[in-house]
Regions:
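Aromatic-rich, lipid-facing transmembrane alpha helices and their immediate juxtamembrane interface loops
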Residues: 1-131
Length: 131
């Protein structure tokens, strides 16, 4: 897998499992906007275009932490299906509870060429996450 893809998945799964429950409720639209921004800037055009449709078709399912985690898990497997890759096992999500959020976000920001808006969101909202 391409380097940007690995760290992007790590960042996104860390994001979903480490975010505080109350943040999803109080900042639901901001979280959805952030996820859309990441998807809209995926370097892989095939992934980006199909992902935007998936996002638009399924984004309303995110109402709490559980549904956010499930949305991203299903989205990851949707992308893997497009790329003819092995499905991502749900139990692998457990490892993201052990990550250090700020460290993952920092690595993501250094390794990617995403717009500053994405990087700034992660830095500015680090207090939204448990560690």
């Amino acid at each position: 897998m391409v380097e940007w893809a690995n760290i992007t998945w790590i960042m996104l799964h860390t994001f979903t499992v480490k975010i505080k429950e109350n943040i999803i409720i109080t900042h639901n639209n901001e979280i959805k906007d952030f996820l859309y921004l990441v998807i809209n800037n995926l370097p892989c055009s095939i992934c980006r275009n199909k992902s935007k449709k998936y996002f638009n078709d399924n984004i309303k399912t995110i109402i709490d932490k559980k549904t956010l985690i499930l949305f991203l898990y299903n989205f990851h497997n949707f992308v893997n299906l497009i790329l003819s890759k092995k499905q991502f096992d749900y139990h692998l999500l457990d490892r993201y509870y052990l990550t250090k959020t700020e460290e993952i976000f920092s690595i993501f920001n250094k390794l990617n060429q995403y717009p500053d808006e994405i990087k700034d969101f992660l830095i500015d909202n680090i207090i939204w996450f448990n560690d």
